[in-house]
Amino acid sequence: MNAALNLWKDAHAKRLSQYCAVRVIGRVSAVRRILLECRIPSAKVGDLCEVSKADGSLLLAEIVGFTQECTLLSALGPPDGIQVGAPIRPLGVAHRIGVDDSLLGCVLDGFGRPLMGDCLGAFAGPEDRRTTLPVIADALPPTQRPRITRALPTGIRAIDSAILLGEGQRVGLFAGAGCGKTTLMAELARNMDCDVIVFGLIGERGRELREFLDHELDETLRRRSVLVCATSDRSSMERARAAFTATAIAEAFRARGQKVLLLLDSLTRFARAQREIGIASGEPLGRGGLPPSVYTLLPRLVERAGMSENGSITALYTVLIEQDSMNDPVADEVRSLLDGHIVLSRKLAERGHYPAIDVSASISRILSNVTGRKHQRANNRLRQLLAAYKQVEMLLRLGEYQAGADPVTDCAVQLNEAINAFLRQDLREPVPLQETLDRLLQLTSQLPE
């Protein structure tokens, strides 16, 4: 009885400590693009506020900074209808979400609010009674991250043979527009062994979102998935926040001991949204025309995925590259942060070679942790054959290649069609890992020692 009474007292003491008898209200003094200037006493960076529009509707905004004279708020939606003198009510809480099994099958906006159906959503207001967690949070300490040791087959021969992934790995999918990255991402979601799938679709066209829901996700997959969507017409704040919302949802399921697959499309559009926010906030432009906040937030985002003592988040981040160049500043930065990368080739896509994975340019930094010596040796031989063929490809097209000079190159030319047939694969036809390994060993055994 005493224990129950103490719990009741503690709960009500916590609620009373958050209660303020004086209603604090600020006023908008200036509107600069997505930034609002006002004065709010005792405000903290990260706190949410409600801004009243001229028509009586409310706009959420977040405190992002201060000057000597005013508080700076970033509007979480279009600031249309905001006028000077509009009242601002600080909510006294940061952006938080509540996560439970009721979220499975839901489609949410960038802040965690429901977009369709009767889903409650994840967004937690100040009166929310659920157990909540912050959307913007720190990653787990390195000492609390177990080593990646378990393979996570994808059912795709081109990946499982040369870039076999591990549970808890963070991988980048680098591709130009039209190379099939979204289709490949959906195929990975269908094939990979996981308990929960969290999709983060950032800056996508609205039409593509509906097509993705209807054609790529069947009912079984939908029942164990959560989709966080911020289409290209949404505010830059929502597009940038969607990546953190999806990651926070994945973290909540991982804390419950589940294996989570996080698919974020794309980090490039996240960086572009953050660039808009940085420029509006007055940040100077740095390398690649990006403000410093982009390079600060990218590692804060991707480091939150990975293994924990309870569960795991295996993360796949797509990155758009222009003209198939890996020297794009976002691509270059992301490649240095992740545990591996898969590169899609436009040349292969134009030939009808799908999935258009350039095995030679793709790599997994934890491959040795999840494969045996035979697999590693066969993988090295496959790459050797692909590299040897690439060196003489132009000579073959011109009819100038002379066989007999190098036995490795001769073998690469003879096996080229067989290798391409091995790396091609139709959709919705997953191949068991052992079958992939057997075919890989058979192919590469013909390479002379």
Curated annotation (Swiss-Prot):
GO terms for molecular function: ATP binding; ATP hydrolysis activity; protein-exporting ATPase activity; proton-transporting ATP synthase activity, rotational mechanism. PANTHER family: ATP SYNTHASE, SPI-1 TYPE 3 SECRETION SYSTEM ATPASE. It catalyses: ATP + H2O + cellular proteinSide 1 = ADP + phosphate + cellular proteinSide 2. It is an enzyme of class 7 (translocase). The core secretion machinery of the T3SS is composed of approximately 20 different proteins, including cytoplasmic components, a base, an export apparatus and a needle. This subunit is part of the cytosolic complex. Forms homododecamers. Signal peptide: none annotated. Its EC number is 7.4.2.8. One of its GO terms (biological process) is protein secretion by the type III secretion system. InterPro entries: AAA+_ATPase, ATPase_a/bsu_AS, ATPase_alpha/beta_chains, ATPase_F1/V1/A1_a/bsu_N, ATPase_F1/V1/A1_a/bsu_nucl-bd, ATPase_T3SS_FliI/YscN, P-loop_NTPase, Rhodanese-like_dom. Belongs to the ATPase alpha/beta chains family. T3SS ATPase subfamily. Its main location: cytoplasm. It is found in: Cytoplasm. Pfam families: ATP-synt_ab (PF00006), ATP-synt_ab_N (PF02874), T3SS_ATPase_C (PF18269). One of its GO terms (cellular component) is cytoplasm. ATPase component of the type III secretion system (T3SS), also called injectisome, which is used to inject bacterial effector proteins into eukaryotic host cells. Acts as a molecular motor to provide the energy that is required for the export of proteins. Required for type III secretion apparatus (T3SA) formation, proper protein secretion, host cell invasion and virulence. May play a critical role in T3SS substrate recognition, disassembly of the effector/chaperone complex and unfolding of the effector in an ATP-dependent manner prior to secretion. This is Type 3 secretion system ATPase. Keywords: ATP-binding, Cytoplasm, Nucleotide-binding, Protein transport, Translocase, Transport, Virulence. SUPFAM superfamilies: P-loop containing nucleoside triphosphate hydrolases (SSF52540). NCBIfam families: fliI_yscN. ATP binds at G178, C179, G180, K181, T182, T183. The keyword Iron-sulfur does not apply. It comes from the Bacteria.
